[in-house]
Curated annotation (Swiss-Prot):
Belongs to the universal ribosomal protein uL2 family. SMART domains: Ribosomal_L2, Ribosomal_L2_C. Disulfide bonds: none annotated. InterPro entries: NA-bd_OB-fold, Rib_uL2_dom2, Ribosomal_uL2, Ribosomal_uL2_bac/org-type, Ribosomal_uL2_C, Ribosomal_uL2_CS, Ribosomal_uL2_dom3, Ribosomal_uL2_RNA-bd_dom. This is Large ribosomal subunit protein uL2. GO terms for cellular component: large ribosomal subunit. It comes from the Bacteria. Part of the 50S ribosomal subunit. Forms a bridge to the 30S subunit in the 70S ribosome. The gene is rplB. Residues 224-263 are annotated as: Disordered. One of the primary rRNA binding proteins. Required for association of the 30S and 50S subunits to form the 70S ribosome, for tRNA binding and peptide bond formation. It has been suggested to have peptidyltransferase activity; this is somewhat controversial. Makes several contacts with the 16S rRNA in the 70S ribosome. Residues 253-263 have a biased composition (Basic residues).
Length: 273
């Protein structure tokens, strides 16, 4: 893994910082673990924009990732590491002893040829997946389930991890990188170690066109719009003089947006406190 700063041969190259990983496989992905992925442009089934600043970008093929890791007590070896355009982390192609292949999130410090295994009482080793109740307190884990058998949902992006703070027969307490403290069932599975490609956060696109390549459209300020488009729009010169709001007139700057009361009981400390 190397961080490369491009030479300023043009305005578009001047600020570019790349992350180069020579360990990544340069061929085509494993065809049996691919599926079609169509673009939405941020629109729903009615054609209305539900998520702004999305559209365009290079075509992508979805890699089917095994987030459940439920093929128990069968050793698998790391065949290769691959780039995945659908996520910030890299992925690893693993080959089980029975001949089946799967994609998993590539953990940090794992190498080609290393072995991983999942199960109830497997060794505490990077890349192994097991129930949280069997993991030592204080361990760093990733790909953590929120419900048993649903598949990992927490700590899946590049460089992310969760620390296991406490555990009893029913629930485990996790400390997320955001500062949030959360409970989850101790039967939920997690993978030992951190997610790899932690240098992803150091990458600088360097120009507007690079954002368009990955499907990100421009973010326009409300004050630069007309009154018909945004509550902040209009006025002679740079007038504002109001409380900041969203394009739909709802209060912003600190207003709580979380509405899922059903899972509120699992959050012991919010990330904003």
């Amino acid at each position: 893994m190397a961080i490369v700063k491009c030479k300023p041969t043009s305005p578009g190259r001047r600020h570019v910082i790349k992350v180069v990983n020579k360990e990544l496989y340069k061929g085509k992905p494993y065809s049996l673990l691919l599926s079609k992925k169509s673009k939405t442009g941020g629109r729903n089934n009615n054609g209305r924009i539900t998520t702004r600043h999305i559209g365009g970008g290079h075509k992508r093929i979805y890699r089917i990732i095994d987030f459940k890791r439920n093929k128990d007590n069968i050793t698998a070896s790391i065949e290769r590491f691959e780039y995945d355009p659908n996520r910030s982390s890299n992925i690893a192609l693993i080959l089980y002893k029975d001949g089946k292949r799967n994609y998993i999130l590539a953990p940090k410090n794992l190498k080609v040829g290393d072995t991983v295994i999942s199960g109830e009482n497997v060794p505490i080793k990077i890349g192994n997946s097991l129930p949280i109740k069997n993991i030592p307190v204080g361990s760093f884990i990733h790909n953590v389930e929120m419900r048993p058998g649903k598949g990992g949902q927490i700590a899946r992006s590049a460089g992310s991890y969760v620390q296991l703070v406490a555990c009893d027969k029913e629930y485990a307490t996790l400390r997320l990188r955001s500062g949030e403290m959360r409970k989850t069932e101790s039967n939920c599975r997690a993978t030992i170690g951190e997610v790899g490609n932690s240098e992803h956060m150091l990458k600088v696109l360097g120009k507007a066109g690079a954002s368009r390549w990955i499907g990100i459209r421009p973010t326009v300020r409300g004050t630069a719009m007309n009154p018909v488009d945004h509550p902040h729009g209009g006025g002679e010169g740079r007038n504002f003089g109001k409380h900041p709001v969203t394009p739909w007139g709802l209060q912003t700057k600190g207003k709580k947006t979380r509405k899922n009361k059903r899972t509120e009981k699992f959050i012991l400390r919010h990330r904003h406190k």
